[in-house]
C-alpha cells in the first residue's frame, strides 16, 4: 500500500513537471512568433489655404465640419497655432523639413530640394522611412513633389476641376467679371454643375477637366447629378483603400506606417459639388468683422510693388490680396454681397474636405488602427476674408498666419482638450519624431541643418498647464516674389499669447495687443506707453535670426554699377512658359536636358551658302 501511494505521487510529480515544461516551451514559442512592432502609426492630413473656419476654432459661426470636430473631441486643439511663412511652397518646405526659412533660405517657390540646406536634411517622411516605417502619401504635401521621398505615392497634386474649352482652363462660367479676369485658379469659384450648353464668350463649348498640369481627364456630371471623382475625392478614395489594406494585414506582418494626405480645397478655384453650396444659402452668410479704414495704420502696402518683369495685371503681383479684394468688390453691387458669395464657396469647399476626413476617420475608428494611430490635421497657412481690404494669404496678420491644428495621439494626448500656447508648423516634425521615438540624425551630412522646431509632446499630455522647450512667440516670415533672400532684409511677425509684433523689411512696425484687440485693429507701435514692449520684441526678433544670410540655390554675380542679372532658373522658367510642350516627361517641371533637347529639335535648319 505504501509503495503504491509513492508510485502515484511520483507519477503525478513527473506529469506536473512535464506540463510546466511544455507550458514554458509554448510561451517561449509564442514570444518568438510575436513580432508585432509596438510603435505608433501616423496619419497626417493637410489642407491647402484652410484658415480657422472650422468648428471649435471660432473662425466662422456657420461652418459645418462635424468630422474635424469629431477628431478634435478625441485629441487636442491648438487654438494659437500659426504657420512660419503664409504661402504654400515655402510653408510646406518648412513644415516637412522642420527648418525655418531664415535657416534654409527657402522663402519662395524655387524647388525646395535645390536649396543646399534642405537637400542635405531629411524630410519628415524620409526620417520615418529611415526608422523602418512604411511611408505612403497622396495629393499635395510638399509643393514640389518628389516621389523618392515616399515608398508608395498615390496621386499628384491636382487643383481641378477646371472649366476647359478644349485648349485652356477657364474660370467658372458663373464667376462674374472683372474678378474672373484674374484667371482660372484664383479668379474662379462656383458649384460643380453640368456645363452642357455652356460656352466661353467666344463660343467655345466648355467641359470639366481634372488631371493637373500633366493630362486632360474629362470629369462628367451624370444625369443623376452625381459627378466623377474630384481630385480630393480621389485622394480620399486612395487613403481609404490603403488604410483598409493596412488594417487587414496582421499586425505582426505589418510595419508601422506614416501616411500623408494632402487635400487641395479650400485652395482656389473654389469649385465643389452643388450639394455643398446648398448647405450655405448665400443670403444667410455671416460676414467677418471688418473695420472701415483698418488698413490706414498698417504698413504692408509700403513694401508691396510689382516684381521685376511683371505686368500690373499679373497673377503674381506682390499686392495679390488687395487686387483680389478690389476685383471681387467691383464684380458685385456691394462689398457685403461680394464677400457673401466668396465665403459661401469657401465654406462649401471646407465642407467637401470634411467629408473626406470623415471617411478616413471611419476606417481608422472601426479597426484596430484606432488605438495605435496618431492623427494630425492642419493647414499650410490661413486666408484673409476682406479684413484690412485684403483677400488672400501671405500677410503677417492673424487671418493669414493662424491655422487649425488638431492632434489625436492615443496614450499621449488628452481627449477633448484645448491648448492656447503658441506653436507652429515647424514644431510638428520634432513632435511626431518624439511621439514615435524615432532615432538617428535628421541631417544627411554636415551641409544640412538640425531641426529648428521643438516637440510639444508635453503639451499633448498636459494641454492646460504643461511646459515645453519652445519659444514664447511664433516666428512668421513673409514671402516676396524675388530670386534671392537675405534673412535680415525680410519682413517678420512674432505672435505670443498677448502681442503680435510685425517688422517690415523697410523698418516699418505694427504692434497689436491681441488680448484686448483680437482683430488687430489698433496699431500701437508708435504710442510711447508701449515702447518697452516693442523694444523687447525687437530684441526677441533679432535673437531669432542668424548672424549671416543663406546662400541661395543659384548665387548671382553682379558687376558694380550694373543691374542685377536674372538667374538661369528665371530664363528656364520663361522658356517653359512659352514652350510648355518642352516638358517631355509631363511631370509639370522643365529640366535643363529637356530644354536643350527641345531647342535642338526646334532649331531652324542652317541655310547653305553654296
Which positions does each model-derived feature cover?
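Short, composition-biased linear "edge" segments at structural boundaries
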Residues: 600-601
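Bacterial N-terminal signal peptides that target proteins for export
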Residues: 1-14
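Signature of WW domains and closely related Tyr/Trp-rich beta-sheet microdomains
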Residues: 511-512, 581-582, 590
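A contiguous, mid-protein "functional segment" used to position or interact
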Residues: 531-557, 561-562
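Adenine-nucleotide cofactor-binding loop residues
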Residues: 515, 519, 585
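Primarily EF-hand calcium-binding motifs
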Residues: 572-585
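Formylglycine-dependent sulfatase
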Residues: 2, 17-504, 508-509, 518-539, ...
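Acidic Ca2+-chelating loop motifs
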Residues: 585-595
Amino acid at each position: 500500500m505504501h509503495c503504491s501511494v509513492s508510485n502515484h505521487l511520483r507519477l503525478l510529480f513527473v506529469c506536473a513537471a512535464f506540463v510546466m515544461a511544455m507550458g514554458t516551451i509554448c510561451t517561449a514559442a509564442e514570444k518568438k512568433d510575436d513580432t508585432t512592432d509596438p510603435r505608433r502609426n501616423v496619419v497626417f492630413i493637410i489642407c491647402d489655404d484652410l484658415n480657422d473656419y472650422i468648428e471649435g476654432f471660432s473662425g466662422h459661426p456657420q461652418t459645418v465640419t462635424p468630422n474635424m470636430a469629431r477628431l478634435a473631441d478625441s485629441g487636442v486643439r491648438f487654438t494659437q497655432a500659426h504657420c512660419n511663412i503664409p504661402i504654400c511652397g515655402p510653408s510646406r518646405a518648412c513644415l516637412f523639413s522642420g527648418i525655418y526659412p531664415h535657416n534654409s533660405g527657402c522663402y519662395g517657390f524655387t524647388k525646395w530640394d535645390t536649396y543646399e540646406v534642405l537637400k542635405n536634411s531629411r524630410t519628415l517622411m524620409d526620417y520615418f522611412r529611415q526608422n523602418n516605417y512604411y511611408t505612403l502619401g497622396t495629393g499635395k504635401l510638399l509643393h514640389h513633389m518628389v516621389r523618392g521621398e515616399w515608398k508608395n505615392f498615390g496621386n499628384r497634386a491636382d487643383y481641378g476641376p477646371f472649366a476647359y474649352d478644349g485648349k485652356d482652363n477657364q474660370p467658372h462660367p458663373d464667376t462674374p467679371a472683372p474678378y474672373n479676369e484674374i484667371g482660372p485658379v484664383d479668379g474662379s469659384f462656383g458649384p460643380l454643375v453640368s456645363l452642357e450648353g455652356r460656352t466661353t464668350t467666344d463660343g467655345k463649348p466648355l467641359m470639366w477637366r481634372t488631371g493637373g498640369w500633366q493630362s486632360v481627364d474629362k470629369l462628367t456630371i451624370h444625369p443623376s447629378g452625381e459627378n466623377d471623382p474630384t481630385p480630393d475625392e480621389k485622394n480620399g478614395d486612395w487613403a481609404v483603400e490603403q488604410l483598409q489594406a493596412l488594417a487587414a494585414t496582421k499586425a505582426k506582418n505589418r510595419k508601422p506606417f506614416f501616411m500623408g494626405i494632402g487635400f487641395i480645397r479650400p485652395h482656389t478655384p473654389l469649385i465643389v459639388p452643388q450639394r455643398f453650396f446648398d448647405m450655405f444659402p448665400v443670403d444667410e452668410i455671416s460676414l467677418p468683422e471688418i473695420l472701415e479704414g483698418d488698413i490706414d495704420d498698417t504698413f504692408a502696402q509700403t513694401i508691396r510693388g510689382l516684381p521685376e518683369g511683371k505686368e500690373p495685371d499679373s497673377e503674381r503681383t506682390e499686392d495679390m490680396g488687395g487686387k483680389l479684394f478690389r476685383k471681387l468688390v467691383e464684380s458685385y453691387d456691394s462689398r457685403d454681397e461680394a464677400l457673401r458669395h466668396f465665403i459661401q464657396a469657401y465654406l462649401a469647399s471646407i465642407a467637401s474636405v470634411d467629408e473626406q476626413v470623415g471617411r478616413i476617420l471611419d476606417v481608422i475608428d472601426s479597426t484596430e488602427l484606432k488605438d495605435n494611430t496618431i492623427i494630425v490635421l492642419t493647414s499650410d497657412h490661413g486666408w484673409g476674408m476682406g479684413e484690412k481690404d485684403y483677400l488672400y494669404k501671405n500677410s503677417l496678420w492673424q487671418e493669414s498666419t493662424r491655422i487649425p491644428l488638431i492632434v489625436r495621439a492615443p496614450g499621449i494626448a488628452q481627449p477633448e482638450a484645448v491648448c492656447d500656447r503658441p506653436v507652429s508648423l515647424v514644431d510638428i516634425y520634432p513632435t511626431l519624431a518624439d511621439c514615435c521615438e524615432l532615432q538617428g540624425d535628421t541631417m544627411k551630412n554636415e551641409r544640412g541643418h538640425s531641426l529648428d522646431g521643438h516637440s510639444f509632446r508635453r503639451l499633448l499630455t498636459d494641454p492646460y498647464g504643461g511646459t515645453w522647450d519652445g519659444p514664447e512667440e511664433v516666428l512668421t516670415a513673409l514671402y516676396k516674389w524675388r530670386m534671392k533672400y537675405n534673412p535680415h532684409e525680410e519682413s517678420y511677425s512674432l505672435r505670443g499669447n498677448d502681442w503680435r509684433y510685425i517688422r517690415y523689411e523697410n523698418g516699418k512696425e505694427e504692434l497689436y495687443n491681441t488680448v484686448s484687440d483680437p482683430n488687430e485693429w489698433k496699431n500701437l507701435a508708435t504710442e510711447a506707453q508701449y515702447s518697452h514692449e516693442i523694444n523687447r520684441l525687437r530684441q526677441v526678433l533679432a535673437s531669432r535670426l542668424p548672424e549671416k544670410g543663406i546662400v541661395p540655390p543659384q548665387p548671382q554675380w553682379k558687376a558694380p554699377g550694373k543691374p542685377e542679372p536674372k538667374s538661369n532658373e528665371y530664363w528656364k522658367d520663361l522658356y517653359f512658359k512659352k514652350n510648355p510642350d518642352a516638358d517631355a516627361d509631363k511631370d509639370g517641371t522643365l529640366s535643363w536636358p529637356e530644354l536643350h533637347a527641345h531647342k535642338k529639335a526646334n532649331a531652324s535648319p542652317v541655310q547653305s551658302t553654296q
